[in-house]
């Protein structure tokens, strides 16, 4: 289930990034349509000049903000994928602490629960590493 959600999220982010590129290209063309007649002394009306100019000026600013937000979201996803590494470290520390406490009490140490959990986390970390590299390519 987690694999499918990562796949869908990756696909959605990739499509969004592609749409932002297309929008930037479109805005550049619209801005060019206004600038070229100005240099050719065709003297377009003010309305024909102002609206595309505003789009040409404000459009890239809007796209820049959207791209920054998208990159911030991708970095957040990468950080979430990295959290499992921290959980694994925490689990290993808990296991070592429990082993030390049991040894102090001269009891046998049963670490099968921790071993099972550590194996589970290692599998998740391996899967997350794959998705982490895919999401990093979007940045």
Model-flagged regions — what are they?
Residues 61-78:
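Transmembrane-cytosolic junction motif
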Residues 79-139:
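Charged, low-complexity cytosol-facing tails and large interhelical loops of integral membrane proteins
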Residues 12-15, 50, 65, 69, ...:
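N-terminal Sec-dependent export signals
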Residues 19-39, 56-57:
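Canonical alpha-helical transmembrane segments of integral membrane proteins
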Residues 42-55:
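Hydrophobic alpha-helical transmembrane segments
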Residues 5-27:
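Juxtamembrane interface helix immediately N-terminal to a transmembrane segment
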Residues 1-7, 98:
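Long, non-membrane, amphipathic alpha-helices that form coiled-coils
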